C-alpha cells in the first residue's frame, strides 16, 4: 500500500486573517522566510500574497545549474533588515516576527508597530516590552484542510 503523507506547508489562520485585512486596506504585505524561495512562494499562496512580495533563501545558478552558494540578502537575522531596506526602501509600518527576527523588528524609526511572537512570560518578552513592542503568544499552524486534527474515531 502507498505510504500516506501530510502536506509540508502549514498555514496559520490568524496570520492569514491579518494579511488579508492589511491587503484589503491597501497595505503592501511582504513575507521574508529562511525557507527556500520556491517553498516560500508556495506558502505565500496560502496567505494570498503576491509572489513579488515574497523573499526566501535563494541559491546562485551557474551555467544553468543550482549551486550551494546563497544570494544576498539572506532573509535571516540582519539579512532580513537588509532585504527590507533593499527591496522595500523604508522601514516597515508593521513587522511581526519571532525572537530570531529581532534584527528585522529593530528596523523602526519610531513610527512602526512591532509584534514579537513569543511566550508572554518568556525570556524575550521583557526586552520586547522595554522597546515598546507588542508581545503575542505564537499561533499554532493547522494542517490542510485548515482545521485542527480531529480525534481518532472509534
Regions found by a protein language model. Give the residues of each.
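C-terminal cap/substrate-recognition subdomain and adjoining C-terminal extension
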Residues: 1-154
